[in-house]
From Swiss-Prot:
Pfam annotation, one family: GatB_N
Its EC number(s): 6.3.5.-
NCBIfam families referenced in this protein's UniProt entry, alphabetically: gatB, PRK05477.1-2, PRK05477.1-4
GO biological process: glutaminyl-tRNAGln biosynthesis via transamidation; translation
Catalytic activity as recorded in UniProt: L-glutamyl-tRNA(Gln) + L-glutamine + ATP + H2O = L-glutaminyl-tRNA(Gln) + L-glutamate + ADP + phosphate + H(+); L-aspartyl-tRNA(Asn) + L-glutamine + ATP + H2O = L-asparaginyl-tRNA(Asn) + L-glutamate + ADP + phosphate + 2 H(+)
Protein name, UniProt field: Aspartyl/glutamyl-tRNA(Asn/Gln) amidotransferase subunit B
Any one GO molecular function term: asparaginyl-tRNA synthase (glutamine-hydrolyzing) activity
Quaternary assembly: Heterotrimer of A, B and C subunits.
Family: Belongs to the GatB/GatE family. GatB subfamily.
Organism: Campylobacter jejuni subsp. jejuni serotype O:2 (strain ATCC 700819 / NCTC 11168)
Enzyme class name: ligase
The entry's keywords: ATP-binding, Ligase, Nucleotide-binding, Protein biosynthesis
């Protein structure tokens, strides 16, 4: 039996307006090679100037994971040649990063586990190579975009733990609002270092790095395949030949990893302090950055202060957008538990395909009005589902307008309800007698008949109240 050893390196693209060492924009999707300048292009004489906002965002992350924030950190040159790296070196941090010795906690199958964060350092992103059939193109728009590289301790023991760690990290980064962490656009990328060892052994065996994984599903599949490949090689006696220190890519079509190149050691990058950049010396006020409420803190508040079930609270903190939507709902002085039901169950049940809470056709304000109409008795909860479905498809229609159009406004007029109840009681005199002789369950029959005659428009609370009076 083998134990799996996994360490993860995450590159989070920081959402600064400009690049880390120049004033070029960081916007995604621009025409190739338009967000560039002499610094991005590594033209002679162009010097880097550090972006202060990138430093602040790195500090915010450090505080969120209970890390040590170094008052002095150093930028180094990481030397390697690749077409999308104009300087033939990357400005990064090596032995003195801005953040180190952090932690976060994951929950897998009901068990909490602490995962150490070795370090988080600032660096610049490379450009992008676009490979055609007979040639390759280079787009340097991304070159110089600020990255925060977050390195975990090799303490993850399964693909499930790795995904739980990444989801937690992704959530923290989004709630801090330091990155949009959009995996499809490459602003949250992961490299997984995977090795195996016999259970009980403490030695670290040959690790394989799987590069640029950009979805939770692919991360899980890549790790599972790599563990299977290494385990089979060990059992076949070919481990030393098959498992070498290398970088592998994940084939998303066939769900296998393939060899890309040999894995470099740190010495091969010839790190040395960048002579164009002074060490970063942080004043105390930099360390006093206030960070927003994080997912775990929100969850505790939702449970303790609002009386929400833990399972519902988990859904509410599953994304920054979901959390903001809920906070916007309860800010309208609505019942929190009613808000949870209409958000987590009813609205989320309608969001399919490309629709998410972020681009929901029904916003928090509109859903809030619907919940108010349930609370004030204008419509029943059952009718409200029809109203929600209607405004979901007809986005220009407001809640009150939809209620009128659909004819779903509840009747709360006592005289109208009393007239119908009188008819039902007179038509069912035998059942009235049975009820009065002790058959209490017949009360539901009278309620049902009244609601049926009222075509669902009667206020159920009023119906119950009047029936109790009439039946004694």
């Amino acid at each position: 039996m083998f134990e799996v050893v996994i360490g993860l390196e995450v590159h989070a693209q920081l959402n600064t307006k400009t690049k880390i060492f120049c004033s070029c924009a960081t916007s995604f999707g621009e025409a190739p090679n338009t967000n560039v300048c002499p610094t991005c292009l590594a033209l002679p004489g162009a010097l880097p100037v550090l972006n202060e906002e990138a430093v602040k965002k790195a500090i915010a992350f450090g505080k969120a994971v209970n890390a040590t924030i170094n008052k002095k950190s150093v930028f180094n040159r990481k030397n390697y040649f690749y077409p999308d790296l104009p300087k033939a070196y990357q400005i990064s941090q090596f032995d003195i990063p801005i953040v180190e010795k952090g932690e976060l906690f994951i929950n897998v199958k009901g068990e909490n586990k602490r995962i150490g964060i070795t370090r988080a350092h600032l660096e610049e992103d490379a450009g992008k190579n676009i490979h055609e059939s007979n040639f390759s193109k280079v787009d340097l728009n991304r070159a110089g975009t600020p990255l925060l590289e977050i390195v975990s301790e090799p303490e993850l023991r399964s693909s499930d733990e790795a995904v739980a760690y990444l989801k937690k990290l992704h959530s923290i980064i989004r709630f801090l609002d330091i990155s949009d962490a959009n995996m499809q656009e490459g602003s949250f990328r992961c490299d997984a270092n995977v090795s195996i060892r016999p259970k009980g052994d403490t030695k670290l065996y040959t690790r394989v790095e799987i590069k640029n994984l950009n979805s939770f599903r692919f991360i899980q599949k890549a790790i599972e395949y790599e563990v299977k490949r290494q385990s089979e090689a060990w059992e076949d006696g070919t481990y030393e030949q098959e498992v070498v220190q290398e970088t592998r890519l994940f084939d998303t079509t066939n769900l296998v990893t393939r060899s890309m190149r040999g894995k470099e050691e740190a010495a091969e990058y010839r790190y040395f302090p960048d002579p164009d950049l002074l060490p970063v010396l942080l004043k105390d006020e930099f360390l006093d950055i206030k960070i927003p409420e994080l997912p775990d803190e929100k969850k505790v508040r939702f449970i303790d202060k609002l009386g929400i079930k833990e399972s519902d609270a988990e859904v509410l903190i599953s994304s920054l957008e979901m959390s903001r939507f809920f906070e916007s709902l309860i800010s309208q002085n609505l019942n929190p538990k009613l808000c949870v039901n209409w958000l987590n169950t009813e609205l989320m049940g309608l969001l399919k395909g490309e629709l998410t809470i972020e681009n929901s056709p029904v916003d928090a304000q509109k859903l809030g009005v619907l919940i108010k109409r349930i609370e004030d008795g204008t419509i029943s909860a059952k009718a409200a589902k029809d109203v929600l479905a209607f405004v979901f498809e007809n986005t220009s229609v407001e809640i009150d307008e939809a209620i009128e159009k659909l004819g779903l406004k509840q009747v709360s007029d006592d005289s109208a309800i009393e007239a119908v109840i009188e008819q039902i009681l007179n038509a069912n005199a035998d059942k009235v007698a049975e009820y009065k002789s002790g058959k209490d369950k017949l009360f539901g029959f009278f309620v049902g008949q009244t609601m049926k005659e009222g075509k669902g428009a009667f206020n159920p609370a009023k119906v119950n109240e009047i029936l109790k009076t009439k039946l004694g």
